[in-house]
């Protein structure tokens, strides 16, 4: 024994599916609006929770921050006026990864705070 810790595998054991695998997310956002940082923050949180997930970004129109899970629109900033709560998105991803129906997210946090 060398006293070195054994390497930790991030690959799931045979027969187990990596969390989020089979789920494809597309986030369409307005880059000139400054929404790229919000996308990157959200994508990082999602990948941490669901390492097997596929996340794709697309540039969208003015004011857009739209999220699709497996081709289904689950959140629209254009409709809701804010951004999704992380917990609501994680729940939608969990449902999709379990093969359950995904409902549209209607709760949203304000896009900015006025002090």
Curated annotation (Swiss-Prot):
The keyword tRNA-binding does not apply. It comes from the Eukaryota. The modification N-acetylserine is found at residue 2. Widely expressed with highest levels in kidney followed by brain and testis. Gene3D superfamilies: Glutaredoxin. Isoprenylation facilitates association with the plasma membrane and enhances the migratory phenotype of cells by inducing increased filopodia formation. Residues 113-115 form a propeptide. Keywords: Acetylation, Apoptosis, Cell membrane, Cytoplasm, Disulfide bond, Lipoprotein, Membrane, Prenylation, Redox-active center. Disulfide bonds join 30-33. A lipid is attached at residue 112 (S-geranylgeranyl cysteine). It is found in: Cytoplasm, Cytosol; Cell membrane. It holds the Pfam family Rdx. One of its GO terms (biological process) is apoptotic process. It is a lipid-anchor. GO terms for cellular component: cytoplasmic side of plasma membrane; cytosol. Signal peptide: none annotated. Belongs to the SelWTH family. PANTHER family: MIGRATION AND INVASION ENHANCER 1, SELENOPROTEIN W. Interacts with GPX1. Increases cell migration by inducing filopodia formation at the leading edge of migrating cells. Plays a role in regulation of apoptosis, possibly through control of CASP3. May be involved in a redox-related process. This is Migration and invasion enhancer 1.
């Amino acid at each position: 024994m060398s006293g070195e810790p054994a390497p930790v595998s991030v690959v799931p054991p045979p027969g187990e599916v990596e969390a989020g695998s089979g789920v494809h997310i597309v986030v369409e956002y307005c880059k000139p609006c400054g929404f790229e940082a919000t996308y990157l923050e959200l994508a990082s949180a999602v990948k941490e929770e669901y390492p097997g997930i596929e996340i794709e970004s697309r540039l969208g129109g003015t004011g857009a921050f739209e999220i699709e899970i497996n081709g289904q629109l689950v959140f629209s900033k254009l409709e809701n006026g804010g951004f999704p709560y992380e917990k609501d998105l994680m729940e939608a991803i969990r449902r999709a990864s379990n093969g359950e129906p995904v409902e549209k997210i209607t709760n949203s946090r304000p896009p900015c705070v006025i002090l």
